[in-house]
Amino acid sequence: MIGVQKMVWDKIRGMDRGSIFFIDDFIEIGSLGSVRLALMELKKQGLIIRPARGIYCYPKIRNEYSAIITPSPESIAEALAAKERVRIIPYGDHAACKLGLTGIQVSNLRYLTDGASRTINLASGKKIYFNHTSEVKIFDYCNETMQMIAAAIRVLTDEGLNAEKKRIIHKHLRTVPEEDFSKDIKIPPAWVGEIIIAIWEN
């Protein structure tokens, strides 16, 4: 390796395995064009992977057979949010699936964001949807579990909550500190809050 490629690789080797990075993380090394070429070459050599256009990873290795572990779509979404300094929360079926409220595995992830709307096409064929929302108070939750419960109830509605789903939600609510619950219950729409309180008090 020579020049820009060596400097890019040296920086990547200093990262933890599993780290996700982007072309502009190397702007101090060279032009975007030269960095892009360096990353393409490192990918060809099997040293890094590209889970989506413009998104790269220094992959973790599994066992003695050196099997590469591809980063999860969730970790890619979180890395993008951190890079762009925006907030994201799972919503819809994605939130319900994370809580175990549906047995259907979600192939495409959906997030609400206070950033721009966009779609990320992953090399695996899956997609990550970021939908902009002006309802900024939904990012004010103290507790992530409360945030996801409210998001899931909004899509399932009261009619979609059978006894088993309410039992699962109740189990999750037991992990929420009372102080967090008292603050967060004021954030969702009134009808969602009423359902959460009823399950909490059950």
Regions found by a protein language model. Give the residues of each.
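Short amphipathic alpha-helical segments and their helix-coil junctions
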Residues: E78, K127-E135
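Hydrophobic alpha-helical interaction segments
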Residues: T133-N202
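Histidine- and/or cysteine-centered catalytic micro-motif in compact active-site loops
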Residues: R53, I61, D93, T133-E135
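Amphipathic alpha-helical interface surfaces
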Residues: V35, Y91-G92, T145
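Short beta-edge/loop segments at beta->alpha junctions of small alpha/beta modules
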Residues: I2-L80
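Short gly/ser-rich loop at a beta-strand->alpha-helix junction or flexible surface loop bordering the NTP-binding
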Residues: P51-G54, R87-L122, K127
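Basic nucleic-acid-binding interfaces
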Residues: K83
